[in-house]
Amino acid sequence: MPASLLELKKKIASVKQTGKITEAMRMVSASKLNQTEDRDKGYTIYNNHVRKTISRLISSQVVDSLREQDVAIDKRNIAKIDYTDVFGLGITADMIQPRKNIKSTGFLVVSGDRGLVGSYNSNVIKNMMGIFEDERAQGHDVKVLAVGSVGAQFFKKNNVNVVYEKNGVSDVPTFDEVLPIVSTAIKMFLNGVFDQLYVCYTHHVNSLSSAFRVEKMLPIVDLDIGVKEAEAHRELEYDIEPDPNRVLMKLLPQYARSTIYGAILDAKTAEHASSMTAMQSATDNAKDLVSNLTTKLNRARQAQITTEITEIISGANALE
């Protein structure tokens, strides 16, 4: 058999084997995607209930404070409230009171620990480098808490201040596994390492699409503080022991932890979806390549057979 035919056969066998590997990797990613999606649903329900409870508790205290001051209870005055006047100095006010004179901003950035996930990691890095540049333009120091080795290594190579690094988060992370990460982030904020914290991650939309998100995590700003929430709290008619402030001192850190955990879980879901899509594309490409190589092989065989037949006929004619 000519060398060209042997070479084509080897290429076809090699590509088929690669296609089997990428298909297996696609199936693994699909399984992990289903697991993280299921876990994400349960987390979302829990976190929404905690947020509503906190919003109602804070709203009731804010409205009571405005009434004591004999101030109009409206959106404008609620927005101007100083939480230290309501809750005093402590964790509650620290976690919800916007800081003045921002000097340093923390970014908890979630990337992957490996490749073969399409444009997942490159999109995270590209977006973050632009954000860092904008933040520095405002005169703010940039401090990064990197979850995932791809982002961490890139940032350190490009002289970004990485103050915390966590690699090897499991493909379907549990709350207990992520707890040291989020506890460190909250502790750094409360200790003044940075004045505000943003969580930056890839949000999973569906199996084919995702969206990069930058969400302010600390101080907590996604609460619904208003008269409506205060009235909803009163309608429940339950007593709080020992008092609302002490309850909030427990609930607010817990809410921050669960919210950051949710972002990491969401990012893992998006990573698995990106990996699944990339492996599906690789498998499809392998099939197309096998088809093209098989066509070339068949044509080469046909040409070889035609040549051999021609030689036989020519030889027979020569003997006549």
From Swiss-Prot:
One cellular-component annotation, GO: plasma membrane
Pfam family, any one: ATP-synt
Topological category with respect to the lipid bilayer: Peripheral membrane protein
GO molecular function per UniProt: ATP binding; proton-transporting ATP synthase activity, rotational mechanism
InterPro entries (UniProt xref): ATP_synth_F1_ATPase_gsu, ATP_synth_F1_gsu, ATP_synth_F1_gsu_CS
Subcellular location as annotated: Cell membrane
Gene Ontology biological-process annotations: proton motive force-driven plasma membrane ATP synthesis
Swiss-Prot/TrEMBL keywords: ATP synthesis, Cell membrane, CF(1), Hydrogen ion transport, Ion transport, Membrane, Transport
CDD domains reported in the protein's UniProt record: F1-ATPase_gamma
Location (main, coarse): membrane
Subunit annotation: F-type ATPases have 2 components, CF(1) - the catalytic core - and CF(0) - the membrane proton channel. CF(1) has five subunits: alpha(3), beta(3), gamma(1), delta(1), epsilon(1). CF(0) has three main subunits: a, b and c.
HAMAP family per UniProt: ATP_synth_gamma_bact
UniProt record similarity statement: Belongs to the ATPase gamma chain family.
Cited function: Produces ATP from ADP in the presence of a proton gradient across the membrane. The gamma chain is believed to be important in regulating ATPase activity and the flow of protons through the CF(0) complex.
Name of the protein: ATP synthase gamma chain
Gene: atpG
